[in-house]
Every structure is written in structure tokens, then in C-alpha cells.
Amino acid sequence: MAGSLSEIKAKIISTEKTSKITSAMRMVSSAKLVRSEQAARDFQIYASKIRQITTDLLKSELTIGSDNPMLVSRPVKKTGYIVITSDKGLVGGYNSKILKSVMDMITEYHADGDYEIISIGSVGSDFFKARGMNVAFELRGLADQPSFEQVRQIISQSVDMFVNEIFDELYVCYNHHVNSLTSQVRVQQMLPISDLVADEAAEEGVTGFELEPNRHDILDQLLPQFTESLIYGAIIDAKTAEHAAGMTAMQTATDNAKNVINDLTIQYNRARQAAITQEITEIVAGANALE
């Protein structure tokens, strides 16, 4: 019985240590989440402005027609997917949701292998490579608060692959942050640009100004920046969802550890009570034997 008591006590101590670790990790993820949510809000200011300017410029461009490859739909022979996952685990179902969604799409629409994957995150890269899938580029070791400079190259490569007709449409697949408990899988078309309509532009915008050198040349410079900003925004959004998933997973782990500790404590008390009862019984039996 003493051995049993010591074993239970050791389990309680071990679980308490685990609970402290998961609680600390939850607080770290919570702090990262707050910073990511602020970064996402700050980015939306820039994203809204560049969208307004781009849409305003396209008001007349759509009227006269544009041959910019980023605006022109062409027959789809191959599709590109930017897939955003985490670099580490301990984030609950964050990675499994997006990877399942991507696999379902590829199974349904790309049985002939007419796709390219641009993978951001080690979990996704390892997953796709282990299955022999078409991974064109990958980015590992993304910072908790990624800067545009860190992702500029892989984003630019993705846009260039579309412009150079390596694939004919580009989607970004990621977990959209809703709140600390919820995220939603998003598969968002980035290229060709098709969701900018003239009535989205502000009533007073750059259409009232003379532009140098001309609208066409400005759009050639602006459209890649606009698309790259959308992809970067998706990365920030995905990182925010990742931190929320990590916080939730660690909170769940902490709660489970506390439940285990409670169960072990009850088990320990019962075992201790049984041991004491047995000792008393033995003492009484010994005393009776002496009479």
C-alpha cells in the first residue's frame, strides 16, 4: 500500500508540473495573440487604402479594357495554392483543418497533378513532401509577428509564377481568425484579380487628378503590390488564428491536467484512508491476540 501511495503522489507531482508548463504556454500564446490582433488591425488600414486607390484607378481602366495579365482570366491549365500552416505543433486542430481542406480540393479537382503548392509553415511542407505532392516553394521558420520583408520573396515568386503563366490562377488557403475560440478555413482567390468593381471606389479619389506617367504604367506597378498586400494580410490573419489555437489548446491541456490532479488526489486520499484503516485493524487484532 505504501508503494501505491508513493506512486500516486509521484503522478500528482508530475501532473502539477505539466499543468504549470501548459499554463505558462497559454499565457505566452495569449500575449502573442494580442500583438497579432493589433498587427492585423493596423494592416487593415493600409489594405483598405491600397484597395481604394487600385479600385479607383480601375474605374476608367475597366471601361477601356486592360491587358494587364493580373486582371485577365485565361483558360486554367494549372492552379497555384499558397497553403499557410504553423511551424510547430501544440495548436489543436489548426493544421489538420487546413490540410484536410487542401487535400479534398486536390483530390476533387487535380487528379492529373495540374497544381503547384507554395507552402508557408513546416507542418504543411513536411505533410506535402511526405506524400510526394507538387511543392514549388516553401518557407519555414516564420516569425510570430512576421514582417513583410520576411515573406516578400515567396510572395513575389508566387505572383511571378502567375504572370509567367506557370499556373493560371492563384489561391491562398489559410485559417481565418474569428475570435479566440473560433477560426474558419478560407480558400481565397488572389489572381487573376476579379473582385474589384468600380462602385467600390470612393466618390472622391485619384480619378480627379492627372497621373504621371499614365494609368497603365501605374497599374503595372500597383497591381503586384496590391496582390502581395492581400497575401501578406492572409499570413497575418493565419498567424493570429494560430496563436488563438495555441492559447486554446494550452488552456484545454491545463484544465485536463487539473482534472487529472483532482482524480489522483481523490484516489490518493482513498488509498491513504484504506492504509490507515488496515493499520488500525492490525493493531486491534494484535491487541486482542495478547488478551
UniProtKB/Swiss-Prot annotation:
InterPro entries: ATP_synth_F1_ATPase_gsu (IPR035968), ATP_synth_F1_gsu (IPR000131), ATP_synth_F1_gsu_CS (IPR023632)
Predominant location: membrane
Subunit: F-type ATPases have 2 components, CF(1) - the catalytic core - and CF(0) - the membrane proton channel. CF(1) has five subunits: alpha(3), beta(3), gamma(1), delta(1), epsilon(1). CF(0) has three main subunits: a, b and c.
Family stated for the protein in its record: Belongs to the ATPase gamma chain family.
Role description: Produces ATP from ADP in the presence of a proton gradient across the membrane. The gamma chain is believed to be important in regulating ATPase activity and the flow of protons through the CF(0) complex.
Record-linked PANTHER family: ATP SYNTHASE GAMMA CHAIN, ATP SYNTHASE SUBUNIT GAMMA, MITOCHONDRIAL
Residue ranges the record marks as coiled coil: none
Name of the protein described by the UniProt record: ATP synthase gamma chain
Protein origin, superkingdom: Bacteria
PROSITE patterns to which the protein is assigned, alphabetical: ATPASE_GAMMA
CDD domains, A to Z: F1-ATPase_gamma
GO molecular function: ATP binding; proton-transporting ATP synthase activity, rotational mechanism
Cellular component per GO, a single term: plasma membrane
Topology of the protein relative to the lipid bilayer: Peripheral membrane protein
Gene3D superfamilies according to UniProt: 3.40.1380.10, ATP synthase, gamma subunit, helix hairpin domain
Keywords: ATP synthesis, Cell membrane, CF(1), Hydrogen ion transport, Ion transport, Membrane, Transport
BP-aspect Gene Ontology terms: proton motive force-driven plasma membrane ATP synthesis
